[in-house]
Amino acid sequence: LKDFPVYNEFLVNVYGVGPAMAGVIVSEIDIHAAQYPSSLWKYAGLDVAGDGYGRSRRKEHLVESTYLDKEKKEQTKMGISFNPFLKTKLVGVLGSSFIKQSAIKCPYRKIYDDYKHRLESSPAHVEKSKGHRHNMAVRYAVKRFLADLYVAWRTLEGLPVANEYSVDKLGIVHRLAA
C-alpha cells in the first residue's frame, strides 16, 4: 500500500479506513475509469436506479448484457451492473467503521449523524423504520467518502476532476469532509 499515493496522502488520514479496507479500495477501484464521482457510486452499486430506489439485486434493477457461450455464440443474460464485493465492503464494513468513530475525528461520522437527523425530522421519511433510516444514512456517508476519494485520487493522478451533478446542475454545494 505504501506504493500508492492515494493511500499515503488520503486514505491513511481517514479515521475508519484501515490497511485492509484501503487494500480493498485500491485493488477494486480503477480511478482512471471513473470520469465523475457518480461513476464510482454506480460501480459500487450506490447509485439510484430508474425507479428512484438504491441499486440492488431486485428484478427491476437487473440489466441485460451479452456474453459468448462455450460454442462462441453470443447470448444475453440479466445481471447486476455493479461490483457486489465492493458494495458489501463499503456499506457493510466501512460504513460500520465510520459509525464507530468519534464525530470529532471522523467527518463521515458527523455526515452520518447529520443526515440521519435530517431523515428523522423529515415528514417524507417518518413512516420508514429506524433501521431503514440508519441504512440510508450509512449509504449517504459512504457516498460522501467516495466523492472525497474521487477528488483526492484523481488530483494525485493528475487526471481532470469533474464536479458532482448536484453541484454543476442543481447548485448544491458539498464541502469536502476530509
Residue spans of the language-model regions?
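Helix-hairpin-helix/helix-loop-helix acidic hairpins
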Residues: L1-V17
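Phosphate-backbone recognition surface of nucleic-acid-processing proteins
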Residues: F10-L11, I25-N135, R139, A152
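A glycine-rich phosphate-binding loop feature that marks nucleotide/adenosyl-phosphate handling sites
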Residues: G16, R57-E64, Y165-L170
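Short, low-complexity, polar/charged sequence segments that are solvent-exposed and flexible
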Residues: G18, R109-K110, L159, E164-S166
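Central I-helix of cytochrome P450 enzymes
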Residues: P19-V24
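Eukaryote-specific, cytoplasm-facing alpha-helical/coiled-coil scaffolding segments in long proteins
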Residues: D51, K116-S121, V167-A178
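Basic, amphipathic alpha-helical segments enriched in Lys/Arg and hydrophobic/aromatic residues
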Residues: S129-Y165, V173-A177
